[in-house]
Amino acid sequence: MNVPFWTEEHVRATLPERDAESHKGTYGTALLLAGSDDMPGAALLAGLGAMRSGLGKLVIGTSENVIPLIVPVLPEATYWRDGWKKAADAQLEETYRAIAIGPGLPQTESVQQAVDHVLTADCPVILDAGALAKRTYPKREGPVILTPHPGEFFRMTGVPVNELQKKRAEYAKEWAAQLQTVIVLKGNQTVIAFPDGDCWLNPTGNGALAKGGTGDTLTGMILGMLCCHEDPKHAVLNAVYLHGACAELWTDEHSAHTLLAHELSDILPRVWKRFE
């Protein structure tokens, strides 16, 4: 299967400029439902990725015990106490530019109830980690973006990992069409497949990303870029590209063994500037 690469030239042509006359409302408010008592860091990692990626304002809906752990590091966000639990009980009352749910959340029925309520919104929705399950998705205005690693793809589809890895692009494209979602199949040369049949490979990244938390950062980056890009496709593709490019810059100066996920967000401003 001949799948094109999303290249540096594509990124330069599609990354948005920051209008000098803009304000935070121009780029909208994003909602991140993430982080539990057992995995509090996921909310912080995704939040840092989002705040570095072009949004106007970020609301983090996380467990009450997680909030005081995050605020000293991410005071720029606002917080919705037990937000992901409350989203399971009722539909969202606020309007958001984009929503992400799943980093650091358990694989429970209540999380899937929160997913159901989130999907009633019109905006783009990212599902990651604990929000990924074998299910169907309603027809809606904004895209649904699934960000599985191979094990999560198996949980979603039943395709064994060893079989998936032989034909990554084919399976991602097939299931994107079947589920009518965007699928970001993470791994070496991440596959980004769209429900209309469009499919791309990402050329950036390296083994430094083979560490816990880097996927949470990517989810946050996609969330932020959905707020500053007009085209959701470009937002997803550019987020994946820059995420990998951050890892490449890291290994220009450090061992691939040593990257910590939060350092991707520290590196991102330098990488982004290269493409402006």
From Swiss-Prot:
Positions of AMP binding: K186, G187, N188, Q189, T190, G215
Please name one Pfam family that this protein belongs to.
Carb_kinase
So which cofactors does this thing need?
Answer: Mg(2+)
Catalytic activity reads:
(6S)-NADHX + ADP = AMP + phosphate + NADH + H(+); (6S)-NADPHX + ADP = AMP + phosphate + NADPH + H(+)
Q: Which of this chain's residues are annotated to bind (6S)-NADPHX?
A: A42, G104, H149, D216
Q: List, for all copies, the residue spans of the domain called YjeF C-terminal.
A: 7-275
Could you tell me what this protein is called? ADP-dependent (S)-NAD(P)H-hydrate dehydratase
**EC number per UniProt:** 4.2.1.136
Gene name of the encoded protein = nnrD
Family matches, as InterPro entries: Carbohydrate_kinase_pred_CS, CARKD, Ribokinase-like
